[in-house]
Amino acid sequence: MIPLRRILIWISGASAGLGAALAATIPFENAELVDISRRGGTPGAQHVAADLADPESWPLVDKDFRQRIEAGDPELVVFIHNAGTLTPLGSADRVDTQQYTRNVLLNSAAALVLGHSFLSALSGRNCEQHLIMVSSGAAMRPHEGEASYCAAKAGIDQWVRTVGLEQRHRSPGCRVISVSPGSIDTDMQAELRASSPDEVPVSQRFREMEALGQLAKPEIVARTIWSLLDRDLETGAVLHIRDVT
């Protein structure tokens, strides 16, 4: 009997929105799925309970990466870092400091630290490796009322470009890419649409897009993201979903 391929998949924020859609559309049978989130509850997934806005939770994720990878010889290992938050929306000089700090820790610091942990856990491993960072069009365009979110996504894109250069010197190395998923019909998008146009002017455009049915379905976007694993993309690529559909 031919043994089954061992496939390990981690998705941060798999309990809702795009993360839940990614978990529901995994294109592999018998994959070991791990949901990194506060709530958990993702069907078919094991759960690492982690509030990624709290740095004390990051070592828990690092430990899980290492234990699962070292427990066997995986042929394919994937980490999709999707977790993020818009809260607090509003001008940087007016929003709550505690919420703003959590935003920076989750959107900026956690992404880079967990990316590092994943790469470190795989260092020297002879298997197919993919790290996908979910970015945003906000990385390229400033949106009033979303300063820390915009800065975080821009930082993630530059991190991917830089780490991609580093991974080209590794054999086999990890393919590291960033993808902006576009405007999706999720609870996070609803939060943005519900914000005041005085504080977040772009919210009006998204309300119009919803009225016109122009917001993408999470499942469709998720399937496109999964298709990136089979595409001939260079490590360090920074993409928009419209460029690959």
Which residues are covered by each model-predicted region?
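Residue(s) in the substrate-gating loop at a strand-loop-helix junction
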Residues: 136
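C-terminal helical subdomain
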Residues: 178, 186, 197-245
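Conserved mid-core segment of classical short-chain dehydrogenase/reductases
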Residues: 75, 85-101, 120, 145
